[in-house]
From Swiss-Prot:
Keywords: Kinase, Nucleotide-binding, Serine/threonine-protein kinase, Transferase
UniProt similarity note: Belongs to the pyruvate, phosphate/water dikinase regulatory protein family. PSRP subfamily.
Enzyme superclass (EC): transferase
Chain positions recorded as ADP binding sites: A153, V154, S155, R156, A157, G158, K159, T160
Catalyzed reaction equations: [pyruvate, water dikinase] + ADP = [pyruvate, water dikinase]-phosphate + AMP + H(+); [pyruvate, water dikinase]-phosphate + phosphate + H(+) = [pyruvate, water dikinase] + diphosphate
GO MF, one annotated term: protein serine/threonine kinase activity
InterPro entries (UniProt xref): Kinase-pyrophosphorylase, PSRP
Protein name: Putative phosphoenolpyruvate synthase regulatory protein
Length: 273
């Protein structure tokens, strides 16, 4: 059996929902080479027919049945896509009818509700959070009064991508503080962070993994040396323990999982955008 399987994320909007769900499903299966393709804004019959032709062509090329993860809200478009002969995984279809029965109300099919700019106030909060994360990255700005969370860690432990994810998906004002050699020498919480204990969350990482990451940035330097990585991680972990800062290892943890842990630990209740 061929291990190659074409997978299409098809949507009448951005395709983010279909791709996110599809990716989560595919990670449950090993030993396959999934060839993925996102087809966004398939919002009329002509586009749906063109998409179905592309899916069918992929099946003929790889001699295997394609998979379509479909988030189109119009049932007619889904029917056209199904003519491709692909395995259809509909994101919304299994849930719409039960909800209609439970709520005793018909659905109002609206394209792009999940990731469109429907609520300007929410969108504005999201953009402001992103600007905040970028301006407070790696200790660039030290005014943390408006921060919802401050991630603390040694360099290259995953602070920046986590802050950006929190901003984009939850509208969280996330700052991050890189522990310097001076901070680590004292093994105490840096003075500029002491007034913000309730906002602090520590990230740690396996020293070997940290060395691999740092080698990509600055190979064969003191910064990326194995001993430096071991010392910095061990010292940071002692500091977190002494200062009672909640901590999570990023070594084998996805950004999504890190973000969820940060939110739950600090009691930040936000809906995902």
């Amino acid at each position: 059996m061929s291990t190659i399987r074409p997978v299409f994320y098809v949507s009448d909007g951005t395709g983010i929902t279909a791709e996110t769900i599809g990716h989560s499903l595919l990670t449950q299966f090993s030993g396959f080479n999934f060839v993925t393709d996102r087809m966004s804004f398939i919002d009329d019959a002509d586009k749906a027919r063109d998409a179905a032709l592309r899916v069918r062509a992929a099946g003929e090329r790889y001699q295997v049945r394609p998979v379509v993860v479909n988030s189109c809200v119009d049932p007619q478009l889904s029917m056209i896509l199904a003519e491709s002969g692909a395995l259809m995984l509909d994101v919304f279809a299994p849930f719409i009818e039960p909800l209609e029965r439970e709520l005793n109300a018909p659905r109002h099919s609206r394209v792009g509700r999940a990731h469109g700019m429907v609520d300007f106030e929410t969108y504005h909060r999201r953009i402001n959070a992103m600007n905040f994360a970028l301006s407070h990255d790696d200790g660039i700005a030290l005014n943390y009064d408006e921060a919802d969370v401050i991630l603390v860690a040694v360099s290259r432990a995953g602070k920046t991508p986590t802050c950006i994810y929190l901003a984009l998906h939850y509208g969280i004002r996330a700052a991050n503080y890189p522990l310097t050699e001076e901070d680590l020498e004292s093994e105490r919480l840096p003075p500029r962070l002491r007034n913000y204990r309730s906002k602090l969350f520590g990230l740690t990482i396996d020293p070997e993994r940290l060395q691999q990451i740092r080698q990509e940035r600055r190979a064969n330097s003191r910064y990326s040396a194995a001993e430096t990585c071991r010392r910095e991680v061990a010292t940071a972990e002692r500091m977190f323990q002494m200062e009672r800062i909640p901590t999570l290892s990023t070594t084998n943890t996805s950004i999504e999982e890190i973000s969820s842990k940060v939110l739950s630990t600090l009691g930040l209740q936000r809906e995902m955008f």
